[in-house]
Amino acid sequence: MFQKVKTIYFGFTLFFSLTVLSDSFDYNNYNNHGVVGLINMPTARFFDESSHGFTFNFSDPDQKITMTSSPFDWLEASFFYTNISNANYCADLEEPICRQDYKDKGFNAKIRLKEEGKLPALAIGLNDFGGTGLYSSEYIVASYGIDNLDLHFGLGWGNLNNSEDFKNPLIYLHDSFGTRPDFTESEGGQFQKDRYFSDSSITPFF
């Protein structure tokens, strides 16, 4: 199924690239997770109000389809469905359904806190906040443009916390922010509030 979708996607991309000017969206692009950003990194940029996107990311082992909408120019929301080819759907391999690839779904959201002016634009976001949390991450990110150069700097929790460079500053507000619950398959469809912005450390990205 994903192979067929991949073929359709490449055909659509070729057609789209021939009919839309390169600067139609002020250089904004969706990243691999269907969020406006660069590769795996989110930015504080947004598409215009009433913009909608449908993205595909085919990598190994993940294949992800994401539908993204911007009902307001300060809000971006998306729903994704993913197939993970190197994991089984469930543990009991004697059952045929368990031998298929693992499937997951979830939601992403990003909110603009400040528009760009003399100071950078500022946004806060959550990835995979309403699913199992397999891809869950939270972030605060700033973006600032200088002519054709767009600069971004952010702080990431969860899956964006790759190097564990700095202590999570929210621990100083409450000790509960210092522990992040592990991913569990049984919690799909639940909002796991005890995971948001929680971790012993954070990682800057730019």
Residue ranges and their predicted role:
Residues K4, F15, Y27-Y30:
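Exposed boundary/loop context
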Residues A142, H152-G158, K167-Y172:
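Solvent-exposed helix/loop surface patches that form functional interfaces
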Residues G188-F206:
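Long, polar low-complexity repeats
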Residues M1-Y9:
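Bacterial N-terminal signal peptides that target proteins for export
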Residues E95-I97, P169-H174:
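Flexible, surface-exposed loop regions and adjacent strand-edge segments
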Residues F10-F16:
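Hydrophobic helical h-region of N-terminal Sec-dependent signal peptides
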Residues S17-L21:
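N-terminal signal peptide c-region/cleavage motif recognized by signal peptidases
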